[in-house]
């Protein structure tokens, strides 16, 4: 709550006026997510086992790589082996650098990952590729629900080169109705539409990014309100 200082009743009456107060914009967050063919992954931010609030983000801010529950499968990462993963199995918690993004208005944004050894699990494709966000999904809108925002003009960028463009991406309505959050899908081998049209382009060796445009958020912001104010709130209190 904004604190106001007053300069005395008589002076206050002389300088009384109004102050237009703009409602603060809501800030949301977006994260890249993926699963490789051998199931190395970064899950959605709100995942109950590997999300950002689990173990202070230990798993979410890394890449989970399976290795047959054997710490010697990838000897160069033996010190990263965790034999007590959240689901009870053992795997590698491999460091990576993620670019997550805050969204507070309509515009174009980018999320991504670098500093990961993409050749480690010998994969060449994705089971899943997505952007998970905490932008609300209205499960009561229409038959399948809908996000409060629209996503468009998406680009998948591999090693600095645009390898796919998606003008109108698929929103995961099934997940949205369960989680209340918006997830944007680019690959999902278990989704009928994406089996055919999902991402099947180049596989990263250095970096993976997803660029996307968000619209409709500005319309969600509350209108400015007008509140009364008295005096100059930047001056010190001179009451005695």
Q: Which residues fall in each region the model found?
A:
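Gram-positive cell-envelope targeting signals
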Residues: 1-27
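Beta-rich carbohydrate-recognition modules and glycan-binding surfaces
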Residues: 25-224, 228-231
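Long, low-complexity, intrinsically disordered segments
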Residues: 235-240
């Amino acid at each position: 709550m904004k604190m106001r200082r007053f300069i005395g009743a008589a002076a206050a009456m002389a300088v009384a006026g109004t102050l237009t107060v703009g409602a603060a914009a809501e800030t949301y967050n977006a994260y890249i997510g993926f699963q490789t063919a051998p199931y190395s992954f970064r899950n959605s931010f709100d995942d109950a086992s590997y999300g950002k609030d689990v173990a202070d983000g230990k798993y979410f801010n890394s890449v989970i790589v399976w290795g047959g529950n054997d710490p010697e499968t990838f000897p160069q990462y033996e010190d990263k082996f965790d034999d007590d993963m959240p689901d009870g199995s053992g795997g590698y918690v491999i460091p990576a650098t993620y670019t997550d993004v805050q969204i507070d208005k309509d515009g174009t944004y980018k999320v991504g990952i670098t500093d990961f050894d993409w050749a480690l699990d010998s994969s060449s494709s994705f089971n899943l590729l997505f952007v998970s966000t905490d932008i609300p999904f209205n499960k009561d809108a229409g038959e399948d629900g809908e996000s409060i925002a629209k996503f468009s003009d998406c680009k998948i960028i591999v090693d600095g080169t645009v390898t796919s463009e998606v003008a109108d991406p698929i929103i995961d309505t099934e997940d949205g109705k369960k989680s209340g959050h918006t997830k944007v899908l680019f690959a999902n081998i278990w989704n009928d539409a994406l089996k055919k049209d999902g991402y099947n382009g180049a596989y990263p060796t250095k970096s993976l990014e997803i660029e996307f445009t968000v619209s409709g958020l500005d319309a969600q912001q509350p209108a400015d309100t007008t509140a009364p104010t008295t005096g100059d709130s930047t001056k010190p209190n001179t009451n005695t």
